[in-house]
């Protein structure tokens, strides 16, 4: 609750004359102010959607008129500045700026519209979510490794709300995507970085979703091969920084204020491994994997403070290039994905 209130009170832009009105922005915990920069990892779109997701998930459990008002204002911002509900195109920043086209963005905003539907029960949100994913596939998304693709959640909702034609079309595209990832195996492409945990995790996730939707055993077998690789990024040291936390590098540099290189333990995307382990455990009855998944999901919550503040990453090395490093970065940026995962699963 404290984190959600902090987002609504401190991180929402409330400037009716600005295109940023309603946006959830970075918060500088040192300067006590919001921060916006058009540089990709500091802008008003992209991963910052995690704040909206966290509020939407929270409100489904604990209704609150003040927080819901903030979320409505954010929904207006998203529709006006970041998503075209007619075509499904998702923009990289406000002003519908798509000068940099990024496939990662689409599944996240489709997920946001699914959560809008779960909260407000308007079928138009499902239609928008479906359009976003259909647009994603039209742009070549079946050859990509997207983070947090929400198809296994969306397909049943489409069918139960009379959108069977849309569900069938999306299902066909999704299974082609899963087949491609299965055939690709461990021959991973270089994406925004050459190789990382969040390239392997989406492959495992999509194959597990395909198995959940179809019951076809070969998808489960292919997912296991991905999990065997994914587990290699994790350790089980007796520290909440290092127990079932996937090693990640430079996230403090890309998303933080300090701009420090170095391993981050944790960064919220570490929890992607936890989600995959949890799903595998639930589908196969593997209790140990379920517990490992829960440990991973809980570890990223250490990026949230008791007073509602938050930190985009924890840089673990004591020094980096001669500079003092170990500690939580001052920027509250996009770490609320971790809170969203917890609200949905723990």
PLM segments and residue spans:
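An acidic-aromatic substrate-binding cleft motif
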Residues: 1-79
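Extended, well-ordered alpha-helical scaffold segments
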Residues: 2-10, 63-81, 120-139, 162-184, ...
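Active-site acid/base region of carbohydrate-active enzymes
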Residues: 19, 62-91, 124, 141-152, ...
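Carbohydrate-binding/catalytic loop surfaces
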Residues: 20-41, 87-107, 149-164, 187-209, ...
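Well-ordered alpha-helical scaffold segments within catalytic/enzyme domains
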Residues: 48-65, 108-122, 138, 149-167, ...
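Long alpha-helical, hydrophobic tracts
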Residues: 84-163, 169-177, 189-192
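Flexible, surface-exposed loop/gating regions in the mature catalytic domains
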Residues: 93-96, 115, 126, 130, ...
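Terminal, non-catalytic domain-edge segments
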Residues: 176, 180, 206-346
């Amino acid at each position: 609750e404290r984190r959600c209130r902090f987002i609504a009170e401190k991180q929402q832009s409330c400037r009716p004359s600005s295109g940023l009105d309603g946006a959830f922005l970075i918060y500088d915990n040192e300067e006590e102010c919001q921060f916006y920069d058009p540089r990709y990892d500091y802008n008003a779109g992209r991963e910052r959607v995690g704040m909206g997701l966290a509020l939407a998930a929270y409100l489904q459990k604990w209704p609150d008129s003040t927080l819901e008002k903030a979320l409505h204002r954010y929904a207006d911002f998203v529709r006006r500045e970041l998503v075209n509900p007619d075509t499904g195109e998702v923009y990289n920043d406000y002003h519908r700026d798509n000068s940099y086209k990024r496939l990662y963005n689409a599944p996240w905003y489709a997920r946001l519209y699914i959560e809008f539907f779960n909260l407000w029960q308007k079928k138009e949100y499902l239609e928008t979510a479906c359009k976003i994913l259909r647009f994603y596939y039209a742009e070549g998304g079946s050859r990509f490794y997207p983070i947090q693709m929400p198809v296994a959640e969306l397909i049943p909702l489409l069918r139960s709300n009379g959108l069977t034609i849309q569900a069938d079309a999306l299902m066909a595209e999704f299974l082609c995507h899963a087949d491609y990832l299965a055939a690709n195996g461990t021959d991973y492409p270089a994406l925004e970085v050459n190789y990382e945990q969040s390239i392997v995790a989406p492959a495992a996730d999509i194959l597990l979703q395909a198995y959940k939707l179809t019951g076809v055993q070969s998808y489960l077998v292919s997912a296991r091969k991905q999990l065997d690789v994914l587990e290699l990024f994790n350790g089980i040291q007796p520290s909440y920084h290092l127990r079932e936390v996937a090693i990640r590098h430079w996230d403090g540099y890309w998303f933080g204020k300090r701009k420090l290189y170095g391993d981050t333990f944790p960064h919220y995307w570490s929890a992607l491994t936890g989600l995959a382990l949890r799903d595998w455990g639930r589908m196969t009855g593997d209790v140990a994997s379920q517990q490992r998944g829960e440990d991973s999901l809980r570890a990223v919550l250490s990026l949230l403070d008791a007073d509602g503040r938050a930190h985009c990453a924890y840089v673990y090395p004591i020094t980096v290039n001669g500079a003092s490093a170990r500690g939580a970065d001052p920027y509250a940026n996009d770490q609320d994905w971790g809170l969203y995962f917890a609200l949905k699963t723990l």
